[in-house]
Amino acid sequence: MPQKGKGILILGLCVLSLLVETDSAQGRFLNPRQAQSAPRGRIACLPSSTMVVRYPDSFALGNHSYGFSISERNGIVYTCRGGHIDITHLRKLADWTAYLTSRLHEALLLDHQEFSFRMREASLYHAHIEYPTSWRDLPSEDRDALAREVAIDLAQYLAYTGSTWHEILTWFGYKGAGIWPEYQSAFSWEDNYSNLLGCRIGAAALRDPDRDFEKAVTGLLDAELRALGVQPKRTARQAAESVRNWWFTGWLWSCRIVRRHLDIGLDDGIVTPCLIPDLADCDGAIPQEYPAPTLSGVEQRGFSICFEIEPKEWERKKILRIVRGDNERTERIEPARHFGAIIECIRGQAVARYGPFVDDCCAKPATDPRSDRSRSVNFEDIATLAAQWLMEDSS
């Protein structure tokens, strides 16, 4: 059989399997008005039990809305199998998955080979797309069905990778608000898992044939939290309080995050959530692990993707120095190639600052993290430490 004929046959089988899986019913993407605008910003918070952290009613989180809505309830909840979850992060990543899916679907149907976008930072994301050899020979209905699935899978990967890049930037001092560095929130113990859940729920909502995107996210979020063993807001705060001076220090508005979650799925493809140890309300709970989004599903359908990040932020020089070889002058980050080295560098810096158990949720420190007053102070810690020192007693 000629090569072209084989390609058509393989693509045809892919499309047939998609139709069987979805029972010929398609989910609903964002409507044209929604798809015109990138997801709105939402204010997140740390998972600590300090004053400004929001703990909503875990069983009444309101209706999800891509646009502004007063019915949404955001903040930190606790689940027995998923640990603390930042609902704000989850909603943002669900929306970014939907937004990128809409844009990618359009680009694929137009045979675009270059796809670029920005998230909330200045960095530019670039995806070079190579199509199957028989792509243009498919009937339009089959092309659309395949493009929808490829767009959803690719959007999950891009959104999740973008959220990881945001955490990397904030670790190195990125100032999203333009004033104070966001270092304290970088890779805090609920971030990665919350982001991953958002991508998963967003993708599932886009495949829901019975509800529009917002209603689907509302229902899927409620179902996922219940499956993870969501707890009342009282337990969410108590769980955080139980790891004070262990996973974080501080009072009132001051907070210094010690426990960092650096598991983004690089080693085994799986993200394991951080569970609060010895929590009575969740005795014997087993963490619910989920696979990190990859390009495997896209590649299995005959597409090839080269994804790069072009950093524009001031912090880019620190990060690029990590990934450049002796003779390499790259100005772009390739996540598949470079994220491993960057995460290991961050882990080394975290261990130097907070001790060897910084990413081990079960190990307790030998001493109070606040007792080492002689430690070196980095610029990004100054605001937090100043508030902390003012609040602590003089003993």
Predicted region positions:
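Bacterial N-terminal signal peptides that target proteins for export
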Residues: 1-10
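Bacterial N-terminal signal peptides
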Residues: 10-19
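Bulky hydrophobic segments
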Residues: 23-184, 203-366
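Divalent metal-coordination and catalytic microenvironments
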Residues: 167, 191, 197
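Sec/Tat-exported extracytoplasmic proteins
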Residues: 172, 201-205, 386-393
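Long, internal stretches of domain cores in catalytic or enzyme-like folds
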Residues: 179, 194-200
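Hydrophobic/aromatic-rich structural module bridging two neighboring secondary-structure elements via a short loop
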Residues: 187-188
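Cellulosome-associated attachment modules in secreted, modular CAZymes
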Residues: 364-395
